[in-house]
Amino acid sequence: MHTPSDPRGRFGLLKSAPLSLAILAATTLSTHLAQADTVNVAAQAYDIPAGPLGTSLNRFAQQAAVAIVFQPQALEGLQSPGLKGNFATQDGFDRLLQGSGYRAVKVNQGYALQAITTASSGTMELGPTEVTATQLGNVTEGTGSYTPGTIATSTRLILTPKQTPQSVSVVTRQHMDDFGLNNVDDVMRHTPGITVSAFDTERSNYYARGFSINNFQYDGIPSTARNVAYSAGNTLSDMAIYDRVEVLKGATGLLTGAGSLGATINLVRKKPTADFQGHATLGAGSWDNYRSELDVSGPMTDSGNVRGRAVAAYQDKRSFMDRYSRKSPTYYGIMEFDLSPDTLLTVGGDYQDTLPTASSWSGSFPLINSKGERNSVKRSFNNAANWSSWEQYTRTVFAMLEHDLGDGWVGKLQLDHKINGYHALMGSIQGDQPQPDGTANLTSGKYTGDTVSDSADLYVSGPFSLGGREHELVLGGSISASEWKGKGYWNLAPNTVDFNHWRGHATMPDWGSAQSLIDDTVRQTGAYVTTRLNLADDLKLLLGGRVVNYQVTGNNPSYRESGRFVPYVGAIYDLNDTYSVYASYTDIFMPQENYNRDRENKLLEPDEGQNWEFGLKADFLDGRLNASAAYFEIHESNRALSDDEYNNQTPIPSNYAYKSSKAVTKGYEVEVSGEIAPGWQLQAGYTHKVVRDDKDVKISTFEPEDQVKLYTTYKLKGNLDKLTVGGGVRWQSVGWQDIYNNPHKGYEEFSQDAYWLVDLMTRYQVTKNVSATLNLNNIFDKS
């Protein structure tokens, strides 16, 4: 059976990082229109203890998901009575500030403290303002920060990065805007510890800790694990519709059920805003790269109890690769309804297409010719025929209902319906080409299909008392079903082309009738529980577990897993207010892909493993700067590896066989993200890892053992305060892979040397509402 050049087959072009020059100049027009009247946002429940006023304001701003700007030293010695009950944002600030001599006033990006004028004292003036709680909420947009406030990817508990006993990397909205990160591939290239492997122009795979990442979440709802060979929009999603991207490292079986051991990617959508705001972006860059974006958000009723947001983006670009181009329209809408002071309903949807021309297939050129010699072509070489195109699309509708149950308990129901489809007419020069006379044969295939997925998740969370202390509990359950239907066509008739003068001219074959059919359905149900036990003021224990039922049916052999228990254990000990140490253990399993079969054509047992992690975490400046260091081990069973002894027989067997192997990943990583000084944002990370099989031989060597990623921006002061400058570097060590050379009848090592990539950016604030941004990517033109 033919598949669209499965990336785990015998031939493939190793690409572990982009090696091209890209220069993008973007002009952003941002307009934030103030409303004539103050919007009264629906009240929500708060329980903030009495204490220092600055601390209370930070906690309130975090829970209300708003910014508060003030000078910390001005509040020294002032106390707050605390806050308990249901309050609108303004009312909550008023209650906390009662008797302090200050009031909170609405500004464009949140709230600012203003001294109350009295007849006897005249006007009190604050010194220079300082953002203290902007980044501490559950959104990153508008905070200007490179670090998040809270995350819930690992356990459903809303925790700060320091309180989460696993490594988490978050690329915020500000980071994406500063460096022009417009799709998931771009974001992953900036994420510490992640390797991006591009199979061709439309298909990418991501790796973490030695494992492919096939766990995607959208607003915390797991999506069906994607089949990398049949990419259908996941990695090309436009970032215009997302607030941030969270990457939780290691196993995440507690919430995902079945999945991979490397990491989980959670894309968090933008939300409507309480005040009207909008922005338009126009961009132009190298190789006719043009982009436009419009984003409008705000209240839709006088009372503000209905809010909406609409986003549209369109990108039309060519490439350094010959003849390649891609058009990408994206539309997104979301609405929030305050059904009552205690109930919030959210509904939305998105519509995305990627429409390429001259899509490359299985790399951009064949590695070897018919003599087994390595090909040398110009960097812009594209192995695709002009008619080759891997079109992808995504259609999504979603809904969420949240209800305050009282006494700090909240119930939440999330529903998601998604269609990921592809329509691929593929033709490219592959294998051991060209022949000695310069001719080559074009490999062709047509693949069409879609995956229709439905997911539902329901949980309740809240505090409970035990042993004189307050603890947290989450109880939930989820159900999902996805049906993948696809057809494959191919024509094996010779289609000879001129390799040495290749311009993409080739005849499209007559596809005829479908020669392969896919009709597989995956169903998964699960129930989960998580608790955060407050054993002491400085010691927290997280316990959790999930019971999983997993079933695959269709025209491939069925598979069922019932009552599988997936545990989660984590502990955090606070050394002081800044530093904490942690340890965690997580578990996960993943049924094998249908092509992972042994010599007898039997499907391999599910891939499964355990993740151990120990580390140190810290937060500084009221959480505006986060740092972590971790050591991790992943012990894997039933890893699918090529059965080379069988596959390399003469004559070559008709089926390609895999065998099960054990593997262990060991490594460590450090990361820093956030504001290291006023106006100076940073995200930086270093990762080292080694993967060995049960014979102590290194595997997954196409992933670099070491990598560094660092991106930073600084807003200048004084007369240059309209200017922001920044830049970034990516470095990775050598990567290599043994690939079978058919003409030489043996394996040969293909490698990519260690390299640095350097990017620069600058932004100039022309007026209050107009800015211009320049991004220079790969300034030293590494290839």
Can you annotate each of these PLM segments?
Residues 62-63, 67, 76, 82-84, ...:
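Acidic, small-polar-rich N-terminal luminal/periplasmic segments of exported/outer-membrane proteins
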Residues 402-406, 410-416, 420-426, 606-675, ...:
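Membrane-embedded beta-barrel scaffold of Gram-negative outer-membrane proteins
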Residues 731-740, 763-783:
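C-terminal beta-signal and adjacent terminal beta-strands/loops
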Residues 397-420, 443-556:
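Face-selective signature of the C-terminal outer-membrane beta-barrel domain
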Residues 336-340, 451, 470-474, 478-482, ...:
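Structural signature of Gram-negative outer-membrane beta-barrels, strongest in the C-terminal barrel
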Residues 315-319, 332-404, 419-451, 495-520, ...:
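Acidic/polar loop-and-plug regions of large Gram-negative outer-membrane beta-barrel proteins
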Residues 536-537, 658-740:
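Gram-negative outer-membrane beta-barrel transporters
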Residues 224-225, 241-243, 254-333, 339-343, ...:
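Outer-membrane beta-barrel translocator/receptor signature
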